[in-house]
A protein has these predicted regions:
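Extreme N-terminal "head/tail" segments of very large remodeling/mechanoenzyme assemblies
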Residues: 1-152
Length: 153
């Protein structure tokens, strides 16, 4: 059985950095505009992999523009399965959302260096992932359909 255990935002959706564990009860409270719906939509995106059905009002920025405003904006999903944990890195490349899979638990040091500086260059991130986890990230997956096929078989 697979389950989403954690979601991480890095320079995404007006959130500089956030890790939210999802493997137990989660209760979101707060005033209007603090990010409750933002987090819930990102979780929903994991399950349906389509920015169209997220309930984002037409007068607001679209999913891509809001969640990935910078070249170093990422959402990382950590997924538990029977034989371990893997991560899905969602980011924007050449103006499109793309996914990369890493067969290892999330590590903040892959993306963030000294002084809390987020790495800009994917080559640097890829190097840090392979160096610390001993595994290479997958190639870019660039379609929602292929992402769903990989996740759900």
């Amino acid at each position: 059985m697979r389950n989403l255990s954690k979601i991480i935002f890095i320079n995404s959706a007006n959130i500089p950095y956030s890790e939210t564990r999802l493997d137990g009860n989660v209760h979101f409270i707060g005033t209007q505009g603090v990010g409750k719906s933002t987090i819930l939509r990102a979780i929903l995106f994991f399950y349906n992999a389509s920015p169209i059905h997220l309930g984002i009002p037409k007068e607001k920025k679209n999913f891509d523009a809001f969640y990935f405003p910078f070249s170093n904006s990422h959402i990382i999903y950590e997924v538990e399965r029977e034989n371990g944990v893997y991560c899905i890195i969602v980011s924007k490349s050449m103006g499109r959302i793309c996914y990369r899979f890493v067969d290892a638990p999330y590590d903040r040091n892959w993306f963030i260096g000294l002084g809390n500086k987020v790495y800009e260059d994917w080559a640097e991130i890829r190097h840090r992932i392979s160096e610390s986890s001993g595994t290479q990230p997958s190639r870019k997956v660039t379609t929602f359909e292929l992402f769903r096929d990989i996740i759900y078989g």
